[in-house]
Amino acid sequence: MINIIQIKDLDAPELQIYYNLNEAQLFHYFEPKPGIFIAESPKVIERALDAGCVPMSFLMEKKHVETQAKEILARCEKLQSRDLTQKSLVYREDEHVIPVYVAEIEVLAKITGYQLTRGMLCAMYRPALSSVEQLCKNARRVAILENVVNPTNVGAIFRSAAALGMDAVLLTTGCSNPLYRRAIRVSMGTVFQVPWTYLGEETKPETVRNPDSEEEKEPGTGIERNLEPEEKADSGNWQKQLHELGFHTVAMALKEDSLSIDDPKLMNEDKLAIVLGTEGDGLAPETIAACDDTVCIPMAHGVDSLNVAAASAVAFWQLGRQAHKDNCCNMNSNYQLWE
C-alpha cells in the first residue's frame, strides 16, 4: 500500500536518508543486515524494480504523483500484494506501507544535486548478493574489477558491460560499491541489469570523509577511498576459483609479451574473464602473473593507456562479441538479478 505524505520542509528524521547520510551510513543502515541505497530518476527506479529491488520510501515533487511517477507507484501497489515478507521489507514493522513523501520544488531544491534526480528519489533495500558460482554458472564473458575506487568509473564500466554483453561483473573488495549513488547515476541504472557480486567477502568497512570538512560534496559521494588500498586483492584465490569454473583469465595490461586484443586465440575462448585494474597503477603485478594471458589495446600517437572505463568498453566489445554474436542486439535487459 502506498501512503502519500505531504511535507513542507526536510527536517523529518525519516528524510535524512535522502540528504544527510553519506554512503557508509546508508550501507550500514540496518547493520548487521544489508543497508539501503538511493535510486534517482524514473528510469533508474524502474530498472531497479525490474531487478526485484524493494522500495523503502519515495521522495518526489508533488506534481509527479499523477504524472511520471504514476506507473511506478502503481507497480509498487501491486508489489505489496505479493509475498514481500520474503524480501527486504522484513526490516520494517509497517511492512505493508511504502511512504511517498511529496513536496513542492522549492523544498526539494534545497537538496544538493537535486536537479540531477529528475524530480524523484527512492530509498531501496540492498538485496543479498549471489555467490560467484551462481553468477558464473552459465556465463561466458565476465568482467573482473580490481580495486577500481572511483564510483564514476564503476558506473561507466557497468553501462558498457550491459550494452556490450558481459554476463556478470565481479569486484574485489577494494572496489567502490556499484550501489553508491554516483555509480548508479552514471550507469543509468544498468547496475541493476548486469549480475554482480564480490570476490571473497561481500561487505567491507568504508572510510568516511571528515564530517567537519568544509569541502562541498554531492549527496551520495561522502566516501573517500584510499587510491592505494591497504588491502591487496588476493588474486590467487579468485583466480583458482575462476579456473575451476572453466574461465580463461586475461589481464588488461601493457607488457612486452601482451597479446593484441584482437588475437584470434582470445576470440575463440569459450569462457573468458577480463580483468581490469585500479585507476593510475592498473593491475597488481601478482594479479597479472596469475592470469592466463596479458592483453593490450593497440594505440596510436605514443599513448600507452586509457581510462579504465574507456578501456573496458573497448575490451567488452572486442572480446565479448564472439560469445554473443547471435544475440548481441537482442539481449534481454529485464532479468532478475537476485533471488
Positions of predicted regions on the chain:
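RNA substrate-binding interface of SAM-dependent RNA methyltransferases
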Residues: 2, 43, 50, 81-87, ...
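Glycine- and other small-residue-rich loops at beta-strand/loop junctions that grip anionic moieties
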Residues: 7, 37, 146-147, 172-173, ...
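Short, aromatic/basic amphipathic alpha-helical patches
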Residues: 68-93, 287
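Structured adenosyl-cofactor binding patch, chiefly the S-adenosyl-L-methionine
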Residues: 120-122, 160-164, 178-191, 285-339
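Active-site/ligand-binding-proximal alpha/beta "capping" segment
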Residues: 250-301
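A glycine-rich helix N-cap at a beta->alpha junction
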Residues: 78-83, 93-109
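Boundary-proximal intrinsically disordered activation/regulatory segments immediately upstream
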Residues: 1-66
